[in-house]
């Protein structure tokens, strides 16, 4: 499984510096299931509306490629318990969703371009990638 956080999904709709590298990275892993949080249904539309409203018609097709995990009690309690005060609430939900999904089936990577989320995920020993991002 590949967990795609909203900052990555935006790059599949709006052309950004990392868009081609991300698309190539995903194309090399077509056998893996794409997953995300149900939160992404709202977050992706809001992000695209803010930065590239002409991309809104592409949101449903991107979401259709993803299996979405509901924000259930386990995910909520996991997200609430993270000790890092710099981890924002929505990022904590993404992290808890990825961590919970990874406890059920192998998680190849969490794809994010958000540095705070990246650091929090790496602290939990999750594999994090940001194809095309300069280190």
Curated annotation (Swiss-Prot):
Q: Do the record's keywords include Hydrolase? A: yes
Cofactor(s) listed in the protein's UniProt record? Mg(2+)
Q: What is its EC number?
A: 3.1.-.-
Catalytic EC class: hydrolase
The residues that hold Mg(2+) are 5, 91
Start and end residues of each PINc domain: 2-123
State the Gene Ontology BP annotations.
Answer: negative regulation of growth
Which N-terminal stretch is annotated as signal sequence? none
Coiled-coil stretches are: none
Q: Which Gene3D superfamilies match?
A: 5'-nuclease (3.40.50.1010)
Molecular-function GO term, any one: RNA nuclease activity
Alphabetically list the UniProt keywords. Hydrolase, Magnesium, Metal-binding, Nuclease, Toxin-antitoxin system
Briefly state the protein's biological role: Toxic component of a type II toxin-antitoxin (TA) system. An RNase. Upon expression in M.smegmatis inhibits colony formation. Its toxic effect is neutralized by coexpression with cognate antitoxin VapB35.
Give the family per the record: Belongs to the PINc/VapC protein family.
* UniProt protein name: Ribonuclease VapC35
Q: Which organism is it from?
A: Mycobacterium tuberculosis (strain ATCC 25618 / H37Rv)
């Amino acid at each position: 499984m590949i967990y795609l956080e909203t900052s990555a999904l935006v790059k599949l709709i709006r052309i950004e510096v990392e868009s081609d590298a991300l698309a190539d990275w995903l194309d090399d892993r077509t056998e893996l299931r794409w997953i995300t949080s149900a939160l992404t249904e709202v977050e992706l539309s809001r992000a695209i509306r803010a930065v590239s409203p002409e991309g809104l018609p592409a949101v449903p097709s991107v979401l259709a490629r993803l299996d979405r995990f509901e924000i259930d009690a386990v995910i909520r309690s996991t997200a609430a318990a993270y000790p890092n005060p710099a981890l924002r609430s929505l990022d904590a939900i993404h992290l808890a969703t990825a961590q919970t999904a990874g406890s059920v089936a192998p998680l190849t990577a969490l794809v994010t371009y958000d540095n705070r989320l990246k650091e929090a995920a790496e602290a939990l020993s999750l594999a994090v990638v940001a194809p095309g991002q300069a280190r």
